[in-house]
Amino acid sequence: MASALEAIKYDRGRLFIIDQLQLPHVTKFIPIDSSEAGWHAIKAMQVRGAPAIAIVAVLSLAVEMLNLVSENMIPEDGEDVRAYIEQKMDYLVSSRPTAVNLSDSAQKIKLLLDQRARKSGLSGVETAMAFIQHAEQMLARDLADNHSIGEYGATWILKNTRAALEGGNTCVLTHCNTGSLATAGYGTALGIIRRLHEHGRLSRAYCTETRPYNQGARLTAYELVSDKIPATLITDSMAGQLLANPDKKIAAIVVGADRVAANGDTANKIGTYTLAVLAKFHNIKFVVAAPRTTIDMKTKTGNEIIIEERQSSEVTKIRGPCEGDGDHREAVMETIKIAADGIDVWNPAFDVTPAALIDAIVTEVGVETKDSSGQFHLSSLFESMA
């Protein structure tokens, strides 16, 4: 059964998202009624995960455009509206430059508007409505793609991992959050875990806490508990011991991606690279799950990927309700200092895992593995789109 968790609620002209900063203690939906509200929600990490970021960004502008249409504030000239939408999309991209889905969506929207508005001579309202329809189709397509990723990934793990072949059911480790809270729904890497569970082939999912922002402890654990999937939380530094323990029978590590370069190098949440190195040493499959929109064929290798560095307070402080607050719906969230005053902090949000450490890249159209020379050929994934 698919996940009942819904993190993005959209009806034409209305967008609400779960404020992920308050999870897992408080489940609160906040309205996003403009591109500015979308930008701030992305920047503040009230929404995160490359696919969800792109969807919320585009839908936030769709809501804004429909409001302008309803208030008769849309210019008559389609060219003026096209320029306005493109300017707003560039602004939204600046909220999270590492997430290729967002920049990819912006480029596709510019191409759409060029074809529809400029070449077809659409009016301002027609241009706005063409954009809104594109945004809504993007939401539906992402959800369908995630279900495909889940099926392809689960099937590959069951056919290609030692632990799965030896024991029937399987245990999987994941990092950060790649589920309904990171996508339109169901998830990418977490979608694979969901599919294994739906097939009755998952013994247990392990999730890292994912410091410093604790997406695993706050978000992935929240989703796993919500879906009643057998799961165990570990700290990031326990991963090596988990993989080394033969009783745990970890079949694979499955992660998402913020950007995949043309050669397969993958930028993802900080700590992913460490897990890939551990997987290689312990001969455990390392699987990246991502829609094709996350693959950036213009970026040749991971060396070209810009790594966002975030503020030191994410490392030196932690936020949550006091343990004795009882009903968390009414709890007062507090920020606690956990590091020595004056200590210098380096806080890269992502790292890049070399393609050499990745066994498979799962997309909505299938699973890509390396050839006999150890090279991915990701361009083949786009042949059907040519």
From Swiss-Prot:
Instruction: Provide the protein name.
Output: Methylthioribose-1-phosphate isomerase
Q: GO terms for CC?
A: cytoplasm; nucleus
Q: Which reaction does it catalyse?
A: 5-(methylsulfanyl)-alpha-D-ribose 1-phosphate = 5-(methylsulfanyl)-D-ribulose 1-phosphate
Q: Which residues carry the site feature described as Transition state stabilizer? A: 176
Alphabetized GO MF terms: S-methyl-5-thioribose-1-phosphate isomerase activity
Gene name linked to the record: MRI1
In terms of PANTHER family, this protein maps to: METHYLTHIORIBOSE-1-PHOSPHATE ISOMERASE
Localization = Cytoplasm; Nucleus
Active site residues according to the UniProt entry: 258
Q: Which InterPro entries match?
A: IF-2B-related, IF-M1Pi, IF_2B-like_C, Initiation_fac_2B_a/b/d, M1Pi_N, NagB/RpiA_transferase-like
Q: In which pathway does it act?
A: Amino-acid biosynthesis; L-methionine biosynthesis via salvage pathway; L-methionine from S-methyl-5-thio-alpha-D-ribose 1-phosphate: step 1/6
Q: Which family does it belong to?
A: Belongs to the eIF-2B alpha/beta/delta subunits family. MtnA subfamily.
**Cysteine pairs bridged by disulfides in the record:** none
Its function? Catalyzes the interconversion of methylthioribose-1-phosphate (MTR-1-P) into methylthioribulose-1-phosphate (MTRu-1-P).
